[in-house]
Amino acid sequence: MFQVQKELASHEAVIVALFEEEETSSFVQELDKAFEGQLQVLLEEKELSTKKKAISKVHSLGKTEVKRYYFVGLGKKESYTTETLRSALGKTFKTLQAAKVQDAAILLDSFVTEKLDAIDVAHIAAEVQGLGTYELQTYKSDKKDRVELEKFTAITAEDAQEIEAALTVGYVHGRATNSARTLVNMPPNVLTATKLAEYAVELAEKYDMDYKVLEKEEMEELGMGALLAVNQGSVEPPKMIALIYKGKEEWTDVIGFVGKGITYDTGGYSLKPREGMVGMKGDMGGAAAVLGAMEIIGELRPEQNVIAVIPSTDNVVSGTAFKPDDVITSMSGKTIEVLNTDAEGRLALADGITYAKKLGANYLIDVATLTGGVIVALGNHTTGAMTNNEELFEQVLEASMETDESIWQLPIFDRDKERVRNSKFADLNNSPGREGHAVMAGTFLGEFAEDTPWVHLDIAGTSESSGAHDLGPAGATGAMVRTLATLVERFGEE
């Protein structure tokens, strides 16, 4: 699909950057020769817009071998960022998709500044081409034909091999994010814990990873009472899924991802209202993020050891379901007083974290659609983070900045630990109250990470979008897939 060339050839469409600046760029000046000065006229008349994310289409009318040009406004160079580029190109690729373009090129060097080099631009362009044109996988009987971009050429004076490598990495990041999106969008009667486990096994076998899928009996033997409690009301069997990627000869410095895999959450006996229940098929967004990251890792083969653990079940009401006031025993041996059955994700993750440690994880990152409280605190564009290790958190933060997936650190104080440890009947309680809800959930998980360096990522606000945006349609976003993979790719770098 991807090609790298030094000069333009015949294409259906070519993408060119336009910045707000006094002098027209050399790229536009060169094109303007073929247009006999008409591009400059269009700029002066403001029919070619340089404003951020503005897209101006110009037909060549036979003056060049290119059928039409798409000029992408990027605003002022001093305010140009990777986020600006991602949004602008996402919108551009949506436009090309709507026009059914199958052969496109990008004047890569026209997007290069002191802040962004050609490798950055190539990576982002390939990544965003997949993200921006993603479509929901629906179950409608009347399916529309989809025209795909079949050929994408980067025009650049830079080293072709380096640009090709960046295009490949970007493409893999975008495709895996879309894989996670598709999982989150699947209905809960289709994506059960069993189906999620089957998907994970197929992924592991495709990329020659080791894997384990624990059944209920094995969980009972290991004492996974927290996950099993959540599963008590369900006819669907629970699964504890583990994928093991060995990127080094020695099994050291192992990064452990733990993704919440609640395939549907009714709230249990702490029942959600109807409006709060619809959409809870997405409560396995953390599991999807982890599997998306493992897809990238499998494709790119970084020299790093990684474990992915997914505790999976649904949380439903029945005569056998767990109840408020129950006391359960987790795999760690710590007992938990259940005050809220709708705080089930942290129970499943507690056993997932302990299991990841048992498998050898030296670092832990859990990802979960965990609390509505994080949405109240941070909105729908920022993931909440908590940690017991600032050095590990800084690496996660740097990865998130590289991928433009915003995260913000929330605190854990001793008084927060006291609240989750406040129980007359058990070591911990799973829901101390509404105040500081997001912080309480993360603090609870920290009790199971213990001294292992750990970062908690609450993606309840960022896992799904209520409306279409530059990088995709309404629905699942694939939040944190690219950040997790980038963390592994960059882990330990100075």
Curated annotation (Swiss-Prot):
Keyword Hydrolase: yes
GO molecular function list: manganese ion binding; metalloaminopeptidase activity
PROSITE patterns with a match to the protein in the record: CYTOSOL_AP
Catalytic activity: Release of an N-terminal amino acid, Xaa-|-Yaa-, in which Xaa is preferably Leu, but may be other amino acids including Pro although not Arg or Lys, and Yaa may be Pro. Amino acid amides and methyl esters are also readily hydrolyzed, but rates on arylamides are exceedingly low; Release of an N-terminal amino acid, preferentially leucine, but not glutamic or aspartic acids
Source superkingdom: Bacteria
Co-factor note (free text): Binds 2 manganese ions per subunit.
InterPro entries the UniProt entry points to: Leucine_aapep/pepB, Macro_dom-like, Peptidase_M17_C, Peptidase_M17_leu_NH2_pept, Peptidase_M17_N
GO biological process: proteolysis
Cofactors demanded by this protein: Mn(2+)
Residues the record marks as active site: 272, 346
Subcellular compartments: Cytoplasm
Described purpose of this protein according to its UniProt entry: Presumably involved in the processing and regular turnover of intracellular proteins. Catalyzes the removal of unsubstituted N-terminal amino acids from various peptides.
Similarity remark: Belongs to the peptidase M17 family.
Name of the molecule in the record: Probable cytosol aminopeptidase
